[in-house]
UniProtKB/Swiss-Prot annotation:
<feature type="domain" description="CTCK">
    <location>
        <begin position="281"/>
        <end position="355"/>
    </location>
</feature>
<dbReference type="GO" id="GO:0031012">
    <property type="term" value="C:extracellular matrix"/>
</dbReference>
<dbReference type="GO" id="GO:0030501">
    <property type="term" value="P:positive regulation of bone mineralization"/>
</dbReference>
<dbReference type="GO" id="GO:0030198">
    <property type="term" value="P:extracellular matrix organization"/>
</dbReference>
<dbReference type="GO" id="GO:0045669">
    <property type="term" value="P:positive regulation of osteoblast differentiation"/>
</dbReference>
<feature type="disulfide bond">
    <location>
        <begin position="309"/>
        <end position="348"/>
    </location>
</feature>
<dbReference type="GO" id="GO:0060413">
    <property type="term" value="P:atrial septum morphogenesis"/>
</dbReference>
<dbReference type="GO" id="GO:0098609">
    <property type="term" value="P:cell-cell adhesion"/>
</dbReference>
<dbReference type="InterPro" id="IPR000867">
    <property type="entry name" value="IGFBP-like"/>
</dbReference>
<dbReference type="InterPro" id="IPR012395">
    <property type="entry name" value="IGFBP_CNN"/>
</dbReference>
<dbReference type="GO" id="GO:0060591">
    <property type="term" value="P:chondroblast differentiation"/>
</dbReference>
<dbReference type="GO" id="GO:0061036">
    <property type="term" value="P:positive regulation of cartilage development"/>
</dbReference>
<dbReference type="GO" id="GO:0043065">
    <property type="term" value="P:positive regulation of apoptotic process"/>
</dbReference>
<dbReference type="GO" id="GO:0007165">
    <property type="term" value="P:signal transduction"/>
</dbReference>
<dbReference type="GO" id="GO:0008201">
    <property type="term" value="F:heparin binding"/>
</dbReference>
<dbReference type="Pfam" id="PF19035">
    <property type="entry name" value="TSP1_CCN"/>
</dbReference>
<dbReference type="GO" id="GO:0005615">
    <property type="term" value="C:extracellular space"/>
</dbReference>
Length: 375
């Protein structure tokens, strides 16, 4: 009985060795280009089958081989068909990946598509992730650009910033800084204002933001007012989701969006089994045993005992109150490793203010990020 069960596994191993032997041989010494290849929007870099060089990952229905692997972060694998001697295949979605529905259309797991000219999206195991193709529209122009405005360019999809160089606009800009900050205002004083300068049509105005970062920086830019918003709510009320924030804490002082993996609670978690007598809520629960985080088919190298938010019996919802962000290394089946930011819950709170987090609305839309779509 045992020998019969081992035969399929042995045959699969021999088939894999045959494919490796017939495939392109790996060089004795790795020789890679000095510069990394430029990939299309939404396409990441992955190591080739020899573990030598970074190459652009092949996408759904594209040709693949040992030296041109598929994008495993999107649930794709190289399908060589039934021939054991095949060295080239086609990128197909793994069988366990779920399709996605977007705008009444069905997309297969791992399939990339453009819903419009400004976004590139990918279906990842039932969730849709999108990246902007017009990054200049997301960031503000330099402060030295008077009366900026976004204008349409003939023949192009993305709008571009233009500056009004008129004398009146320059005087308005100079008067703004003289009045609001004073000409001798230090960079530290500007940072403590905890305000972000927003340049809008018709002039400039101050917008409050949340959670300003400490003033000390690895880089110094005297013209940059470093500000960072709070993390958004997790895109899922159970299971793995995404949380985002906006910051200009970078050498270019450009507004960028950062993401982190989050999990408010595991799906299928018993809601009220652990409630003590007379209690209506379970705020924070710790994982009973060490677990590995999962992301895009890959698992964390180490095990953790994270805290989760509980639930209530009186209609209130429990959401994270205090969190921290840690860097966690993930490893995939092919040996590839990468690091992602992950939310760690420190405490939760329960209240009746449940926008998009009520159990009656299990998913909500998070623009330009991984989310579930629901009509």
């Amino acid at each position: 009985m045992g020998s019969a069960g081992a035969r399929p596994a042995l045959a699969a191993a021999l088939l894999c060795l045959a494919r490796l032997a017939l495939g392109s041989p790996c060089p004795a010494v790795c020789q890679c280009p000095a510069a990394a290849p430029q990939c299309a929007p939404g396409v990441g870099l992955v190591p080739d089958g020899c573990g030598c060089c970074k190459v652009c990952a092949k996408q759904l229905n594209e040709d693949c081989s040992r030296t041109q692997p598929c994008d495993h972060t999107k649930g794709l694998e190289c399908n060589f068909g039934a021939s054991p001697a095949a060295t080239n295949g086609i990128c197909r979605a793994q069988s366990e990946g779920r399709p996605c529905e977007y705008n009444s259309k069905i997309y297969q797991n791992g399939e990339s598509f453009q819903p419009n000219c400004k976004h590139q999206c990918t279906c990842i195991d039932g969730a849709v992730g999108c990246i902007p193709l017009c990054p200049q529209e997301l960031s503000l122009p330099n402060l030295g650009c008077p009366s900026p405005r976004l204008v349409k360019v003939p023949g192009q999809c993305c709008e571009e910033w233009v500056c009004d160089e008129s004398k009146d606009a320059l005087e308005e800009l100079e008067g703004f800084f003289s009045k609001e900050f004073g000409l001798d205002a230090s960079e530290g004083e500007l940072t403590r204002n905890n305000e972000l300068i927003a340049i809008v049509k018709g002039g400039l105005k101050m917008l409050p933001v949340f959670g300003s970062e400490p003033q000390s920086r690895a880089f110094e830019n005297p013209k940059c007012i470093v500000q960072t918003t709070s993390w958004s709510q997790c895109s899922k009320t159970c299971g793995t989701g995404i949380s985002t924030r906006v910051t200009n804490d970078n050498p270019d002082c450009k507004l960028i969006k950062e993401t982190r993996i989050c999990e408010v609670r595991p799906c299928g978690q018993p809601s009220y089994a652990s409630l003590k007598k007379g209690k209506k809520c379970t705020k924070t629960k710790k994982s009973p045993s060490p677990v590995r985080f999962t992301y895009a088919g890959c698992s964390s190298v180490k095990k953790y005992r994270p805290k989760y938010c509980g639930s209530c019996v009186d209609g209130r919802c429990c959401t994270p109150q205090q969190t921290r962000t840690v860097k966690i290394r993930f490893r995939c089946d092919d040996g590839e490793t990468f690091t992602k930011s992950v939310m760690m819950i420190q405490s939760c709170r329960c209240n009746y203010n449940c926008p998009h987090a009520n159990e009656a609305y299990p998913f909500y839309r998070l623009v330009n990020d991984i989310h579930k779509f629901r009509d």
